[in-house]
Amino acid sequence: MANIKQQKKRNKTNEKRRLQNFSFKSSVKTVVKQVKTAVANADKQKALALLSVAYKKFDKGVSKRVYHANFSARNKSDLQKLVNTL
């Protein structure tokens, strides 16, 4: 446990950010699953619409430093390849 006052404050903010990051990552995973489901159901229009949402979320995650840029690029590329199979 921290004894220094500033470290106690940092622990609070770190926990708050951790929960926000977890929530954000969960929402991204949900959209990715929806894209994969749309591809499995051969619904190209829905897949393309959800792909756009996924791209936005990955880019937002990079700008908020939730994700590394390479992680985001790799996942966007994989999703695009998946949608292109339709």
Curated annotation (Swiss-Prot):
Protein's UniProt name: Small ribosomal subunit protein bS20
Pfam family, one: Ribosomal_S20p
KW RNA-binding (keyword) present: yes
Compositionally biased spans, kind Basic residues: 1-11
An example Gene Ontology biological process: translation
Family indicated by similarity: Belongs to the bacterial ribosomal protein bS20 family.
An example Gene Ontology molecular-function term: small ribosomal subunit rRNA binding
Any one cellular-component term (Gene Ontology): small ribosomal subunit
Keywords attached to this entry: Ribonucleoprotein, Ribosomal protein, RNA-binding, rRNA-binding
Superkingdom classification of source: Bacteria
Function comment: Binds directly to 16S ribosomal RNA.
Annotated Gene3D superfamilies: Ribosomal protein S20
Taxonomic lineage: Bacteria, Bacillati, Mycoplasmatota, Mollicutes, Acholeplasmatales
InterPro entries: Ribosomal_bS20, Ribosomal_bS20_sf
Region called Disordered, residue ranges: 1-20
